[in-house]
Swiss-Prot record:
Pfam families: YfbU. Transmembrane segments: none annotated. This is UPF0304 protein ECA3037. InterPro entries: UPF0304_YfbU (IPR005587), YfbU_alpha-helical_sf (IPR023146), YfbU_helix-hairpin_sf (IPR023145). Belongs to the UPF0304 family. Gene3D superfamilies: Helix hairpin bin, yfbu gene product, domain 2.
Length: 164
């Protein structure tokens, strides 16, 4: 992240104020203030992640993934014959914090701030799947979107989606 000295000074002052306004996170803000003031390039890359951007298309895809998981859970609940389907495989795991942090942040925003999908279990890791999920979810989405009745899935359709 490239910043002028004036921009670094402004951001440093913002972090200084945040240490006073949010004492619970003061250490984090002091650390960021030091990084900005001293211009540590490697650590300043962390800010790139915090100030990242997700396109509208990516946001819609993530919402579709979450909606697909909702549909899987609804369909499973309505099934009379569950045919050895393991309910745990229908759980929305989230995204990998290490490689898909922006996607994970959007999921947390949707659930905790926007109040969408409150029935999703964040688990002990807060939707951190701890493995890359984007490609898996896009394969699952392709199968789900080809189903004629997306919220009334059969056991076979559910199995096809989760095995995609």
């Amino acid at each position: 992240m490239e910043m002028t000295n004036a921009q670094r000074l402004i951001l440093s002052n913002q972090y200084k104020m945040m240490t006073m306004l949010d004492p619970d996170n003061a250490e984090r803000y002091r650390r960021l203030q030091t990084i900005i003031e001293r211009g540590y390039g490697l650590q300043m890359r962390e800010l790139d992640r915090e100030f990242g951007e997700l396109t509208e298309e990516v946001c819609r895809t993530i919402i579709n993934v979450m909606e697909m998981h909702h549909a899987l859970q609804v369909s499973w609940t309505n099934l009379k014959d569950k045919q050895d389907l393991d309910e745990r495989r229908l759980t929305f795991l989230g995204f990998d914090a290490a490689t898909e942090a922006r996607y994970l942040g959007f999921v947390r925003f949707m659930v905790h701030v926007e109040g969408r999908y409150p029935h999703f279990d964040a688990g002990t890791h807060g939707f951190n799947a701890q493995t890359k999920m984007w490609e898996k979810y896009t394969r699952m989405l392709a199968v789900w979107q080809s189903c004629p009745r997306q919220y009334h899935l059969s056991a076979v359709e559910i199995a096809q989606i989760i095995n995609a």
